């Protein structure tokens, strides 16, 4: 086993000392008449050792409101139960059956470890030695327990480990508990769907760090069960002993389930793979299986253009989905549509200052070719066919080693930073000759080995990227139990209980005339309710992959039978509703031609807003009732005294809803003096009230309305004018760094009040006057308006109207001044010139303090704007004539085009759109040709012309 967060250690590897007296500290060990107490400032455990036998003592939780809460396991409780098989014989060995040999402790990083060693005990004629290790750290509100088991090496073949129960606590009558319910199948069986969940006992949570452990309350006993089915000769060992997966016991602030869940999720975040906000494009709903190397490149270019020209930071990845594999071959390989494999797509993503991602379906995809592909793989000796599910047996070691080799190879060759691993074991495979485990209750021998091997593969994938100083996002999709403990290896997991997309009409207040995106939201959010409230799966929504947003040409409307359509407002509601769910992972399933200017503006604004508020949104909780019944529902997310609450009315009639600002929806008890701004529908100023913990908020929602409220300290910083430019012969564009309002606004152009239009992003104002501007003359701007926080905004600016955005066009000669005034400010621009030189270490063009274009000592072309620099991928000082286009985009990215083709890009998040001072533009050593400076960033298709 390879652990991502906590690595159990053998007792032989640490310096353990006898526990002979009380040991104080941030983590303490105290001897009592009953035994030994292990504790810290959050909680403590008593291990009863009376009579030389171990029994489960009380647990004291100091985190609860008021007095500390004590949990007392029932008399039948056991710290562990081991079950063995030898031939047809079975035996069980409980902690209480063993005689304690010694108590010892060791100092470990940040805490202490307690070891309880037992005298060897005969099991089915073989001596078995067990040690219990409990590890507690000073800063943790949870401890871990695991056991160390050994048998004589020469007899290891004779004894099989069936299963282990850890923290087997008998639940006494009247104790408040929660355990996962019996649930319906979601492609995989209901039993397997429920694996890897915690149990709640009073104000405690209990679980196992193996994501396929069977943890639940059964017959009045809470326990976490690990299945094996392997003989001790085949179990993985460390220093000759078998180490179990750790069980976890944690303390929460309350026995209320919502609070328990929040505190459990806090623990999960400590063991999870680092996961931040992520945005990327995926080809699936644009082309589905009809992707080619050419149309992928075309879509990448168009999506990047739409996002970049609206100020969105570079995507975290551009992803090729299914359609690249040749399903007629004996293993994963490229079909004839990808003659250069993925090199063109991967290279283009890099040229966007982005990364590349890829889909692979371990089971063989989801097409009519899947069963045949499994047969081809078996015939080629690269794996086997699972007869139960008629797909690839994903547990066969030969196949696992083959795909691991492919993963590592593809990451090396194509620099992949994202994998969409789509489809694992739909049904447990019964064929032992495939080289994997079979049998056990609910086929759990198969399931345990399956996920132990796959998590080892994920570890190897991450290790390769980490050694290269690079990141990796693993998206774990279909036929996976959504256990939060998988997050030790993966970043996101598909919700399992949903289709990729669908359309649903509420049973109350719904109509066949409901919009496409309304029906899509109702469907997906109903699946969220099924996930959270029906199945009661304890999984943080920030890590839940939900296949949204979808706005692609392959999705057909049930109303029109044509490609789905959304109005500007419907599209805005759709994206904000997705943001409110708290997902960290935005995979844009878009077709670029379906997004008009307003939709691009909205997409850019929502992505910026969601990322800026992700520290809040990542804590989202569902509130209300499922939209399937037409009821108001939403999401509530809080980080300290900052909160975002969304509500949606899925019905076609008006409805009322009241929110109570308490900890059940995530509000901290000390929250006070909070202001409230309405994000959606956009309200230009706060409501002027002060809110505190426990307050109620009554709302009336119009039919199909999405309402989003943001709570927190009042924002006193007024919006700032970010970029001002002439947008036409009689209009200027004013872009602010926050939302603004044009209501009552006063914007003067050369002293005359302008007609104002607020753009769909709510950040940009178009101010137009009746008289045309004079070419190449300054336009004086005076603006007085309010921002979304109600702050008064007063700005003055001066812009020059350049017909066709051309600042100048001039013939270059060495040392010549091409223009007295070039570019200035934080905006985008383009510099274009021809180049034919053999010089090195030579400045070609420059505007002091703003930009330089130069040939470096190695012959590469370098374009520097402020403190950001982009270099060509190859030398340009070979004397050949070529055209150069260098530009800064609206999102601050620098790009270099050579002969009309994108060659390289650079982006620095710490130096976005640095303000550039005005100044003269000079040709230094540029030998000649016509130079153009343009007051906007040209798009790739304009440059190619």
Language model: regions and residue ranges:
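Active-site-proximal substrate-binding groove within the catalytic cores of carbohydrate-active enzymes
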Residues: 40-41, 238-240, 453-686, 696-708
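Aromatic- and carboxylate-enriched substrate-binding clefts and catalytic-loop regions
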Residues: 314-551
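Short, aromatic/His-centered strand-loop micro-motif at the edge of beta-sheets
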Residues: 862-883
């Amino acid at each position: 086993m390879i652990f991502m967060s906590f690595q159990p250690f053998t007792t032989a590897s640490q310096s353990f000392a006898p526990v002979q007296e009380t040991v104080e500290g941030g983590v303490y060990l105290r001897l009592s008449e009953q035994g030994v107490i292990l504790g810290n400032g959050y909680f403590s455990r008593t291990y009863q050792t009376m009579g030389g036998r171990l029994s489960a003592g009380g647990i004291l939780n100091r985190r609860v409101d008021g007095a500390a809460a004590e949990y007392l396991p029932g008399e039948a409780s056991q710290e562990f139960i081991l079950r063995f098989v030898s031939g047809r014989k079975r035996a069980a060995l409980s902690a209480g059956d063993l005689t304690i040999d010694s108590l010892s402790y060791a100092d470990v990083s940040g805490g202490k470890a307690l070891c309880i060693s037992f005298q060897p005990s005969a099991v089915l004629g073989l001596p078995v030695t067990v040690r219990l290790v409990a590890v507690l750290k000073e800063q943790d509100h949870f401890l871990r327990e695991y056991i160390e088991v050994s048998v004589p090496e020469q007899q290891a073949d004779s004894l099989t480990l069936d299963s282990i129960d850890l923290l087997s606590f008998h639940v006494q009558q009247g104790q408040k508990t929660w355990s996962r319910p019996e649930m319906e199948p979601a492609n995989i069986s209901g039993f397997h769907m429920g694996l890897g969940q915690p149990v709640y006992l009073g104000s405690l949570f209990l679980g196992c760090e193996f994501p396929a452990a069977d943890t639940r309350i059964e017959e009045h006993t809470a326990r976490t069960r690990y299945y094996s089915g392997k003989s001790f000769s085949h179990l993985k060992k460390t220093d000759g002993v078998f180490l179990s997966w750790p069980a976890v016991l944690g303390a929460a602030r309350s026995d209320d389930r919502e609070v328990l869940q929040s505190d459990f999720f806090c623990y999960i975040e400590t063991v999870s793979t680092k996961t931040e906000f992520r945005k990327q494009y995926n080809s699936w709903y644009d082309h589905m299986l009809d992707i080619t190397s050419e149309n992928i490149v075309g879509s990448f270019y168009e999506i990047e253009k739409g996002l970049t020209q609206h100020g969105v930071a570079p995507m975290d990845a551009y992803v090729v989905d299914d359609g690249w594999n040749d399903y007629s071959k004996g293993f994963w390989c490229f079909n004839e549509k990808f003659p250069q494999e993925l090199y063109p797509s991967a290279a283009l993503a890099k040229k966007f200052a982005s990364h590349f991602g890829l889909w692979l379906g371990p089971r063989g995809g989801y097409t009519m070719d899947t069963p045949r592909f499994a047969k081809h793989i078996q015939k080629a000796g690269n794996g086997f066919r699972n007869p139960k599910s008629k797909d690839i047996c994903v547990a066969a070691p030969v196949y696992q080693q083959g795909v691991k080799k492919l993963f590592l190879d593809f990451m090396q060759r194509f620099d992949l930073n994202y994998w969409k691993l789509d489809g694992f074991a739909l049904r447990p495979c019964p064929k032992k000759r495939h080289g994997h485990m079979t049998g056990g209750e609910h086929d759990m021998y198969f399931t345990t080995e399956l996920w132990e091997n796959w998590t080892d593969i994920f570890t190897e994938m991450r290790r390769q990227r980490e050694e290269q100083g690079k990141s990796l996002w693993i998206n774990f999709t279909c036929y996976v139990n959504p256990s939060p403990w998988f997050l030790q290896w993966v970043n996101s997991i598909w919700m399992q209980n949903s289709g990729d997309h669908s359309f649903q009409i509420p049973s109350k207040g719904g109509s066949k005339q409901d919009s496409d995106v309304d029906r899509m939201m109702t469907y997906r959010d109903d699946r969220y309710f099924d996930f959270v409230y029906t199945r009661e799966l304890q999984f943080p929504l920030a890590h839940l992959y939900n296949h949204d947003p979808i706005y692609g040409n392959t999705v057909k409307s049930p109303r029109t039978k044509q490609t789905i359509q959304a109005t500007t407002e419907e599209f805005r509601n759709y994206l904000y509703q997705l943001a409110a769910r708290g997902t960290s992972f935005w995979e844009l399933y878009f077709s670029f031609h379906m997004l008009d200017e307003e939709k691009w503006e909205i997409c850019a604004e929502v992505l910026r807003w969601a990322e800026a508020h992700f520290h809040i949104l990542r804590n989202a909780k569902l509130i209300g009732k499922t939209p399937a019944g037409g009821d108001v529902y939403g999401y509530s997310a809080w980080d300290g005294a900052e909160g975002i609450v969304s509500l949606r009315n899925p019905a076609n009639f008006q409805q009322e809803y009241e929110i109570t600002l308490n900890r059940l929806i995530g509000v901290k008890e000390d929250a006070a003096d909070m202001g409230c701004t309405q994000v959606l529908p956009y309200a230009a100023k706060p409501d002027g009230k002060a809110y505190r913990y426990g307050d109620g908020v009554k709302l009336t929602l119009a039919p199909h309305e999405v309402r989003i409220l943001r709570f927190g300290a009042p924002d006193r910083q007024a919006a700032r004018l970010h970029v001002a430019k002439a947008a036409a012969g009689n209009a200027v564009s004013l872009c602010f760094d926050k939302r603004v309002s044009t209501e009552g606004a006063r914007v003067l152009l050369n002293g005359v009040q302008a007609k104002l239009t607020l753009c769909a992003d709510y950040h940009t104002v178009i101010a137009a006057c009746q008289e045309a501007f004079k070419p190449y003359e300054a336009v004086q701007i005076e603006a007085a308006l309010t921002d979304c926080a109600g702050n008064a905004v007063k700005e003055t600016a001066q812009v020059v109207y350049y017909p066709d955005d051309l600042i100048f066009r001039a013939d270059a000669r060495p040392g010549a001044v091409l223009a007295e005034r070039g570019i200035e400010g934080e905006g985008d621009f383009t510099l274009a010139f021809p180049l034919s030189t053999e010089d090195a270490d030579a400045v070609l063009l420059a505007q002091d303090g703003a930009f330089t274009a130069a040939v470096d000592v190695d012959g590469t072309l370098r374009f520097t704007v402020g403190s950001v620099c982009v270099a060509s991928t190859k030398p340009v000082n070979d004397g050949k004539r070529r055209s150069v286009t260098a530009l800064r985009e609206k999102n601050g990215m620098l790009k270099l085009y050579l002969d009309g083709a994108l060659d390289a890009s650079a982006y620095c998040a710490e130096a976005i759109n640095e303000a550039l001072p005005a100044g003269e533009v000079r040709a230094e050593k540029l030998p000649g040709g016509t130079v153009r400076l343009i007051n906007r960033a040209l798009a790739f298709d304009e440059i190619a012309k």
